[in-house]
Amino acid sequence: LLGELVTKHGTTVWLVNTGWSGGPAGVSDRMPIAYTRAMIAAALDGGLASVPTTPDPVFGVFVPERCPGVPSEILQPRSAWKDPEAYDEQARRLAEMFRQNFEPIAGLVPAEVREAGPRVG
């Protein structure tokens, strides 16, 4: 239903990280509220509409390459981590957890939803 409404009304959907950035909990910092506000403002005022995006190789979401008021490295999670290989491992773990959690209902959703999930491997 959500997908139908998004398509019907031509809505753009943005996912905003308001949690940890730069590493796992306990090692990194929370996303600064000023950056969160800047991302939301840019999404609402159309400031992200023409910005180039890069697809995340694991999660498949398209990440803006820049956003007014936000350092570019913050937008790319792997670049924000001090240890990019540790990010890769955590991303793989999270993708696998998602896959396992989704498995019981996978047959109940359309193929396009199943195919939009994280790429585990």
Per-segment meaning from a language model:
Residues 1-121:
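Conserved NTP phosphate-binding and transfer environment spanning the P-loop NTPase/kinase superfamily
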